[in-house]
Design a protein with these regions (language model features):
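Positively charged, small/polar-rich N-terminal and surface patches that mediate targeting and assembly
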Residues: 1-31, 36, 51-93
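Acidic, metal-coordinating catalytic cores used for nucleic-acid/nucleotide bond scission
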Residues: 39
Length: 93
């Protein structure tokens, strides 16, 4: 991204993988999380974690598919011209 931010893709396999996700989001990067490798209870815990993270830092979460989330930090707008995004299920604005 032009302003020095990155788009970082994570494929977590357990809740233990939440820390680097949080660190990259906290640093202002856009984070794409593919939760398809997680067991349902682990996925639920991770979604709870990122929801709190995004709320605390004023960003947005977008559900791209049933298992893929985009975490957008403040100041980043996610657009989808094909209307595949089911919408922001947490919008701080």
């Amino acid at each position: 991204m032009a302003d020095g931010r990155s788009i970082v893709v994570f494929h977590p396999t357990s809740y233990r993988d939440s820390r680097p996700i949080g660190e990259r989001f906290r640093d202002g990067d856009v984070v794409l999380c593919d939760l398809s490798w997680l067991e349902p209870d682990e996925a639920h815990r991770l979604v709870d974690f990122v929801a709190g993270l995004v709320f605390g830092l004023g960003g947005n979460i977008y559900k791209v598919t049933a298992h893929v989330l985009v975490l957008a930090p403040p100041g980043v707008t996610v657009l989808d011209d094909a209307e595949h995004l089911t919408g922001s299920f947490y919008n701080q604005s």
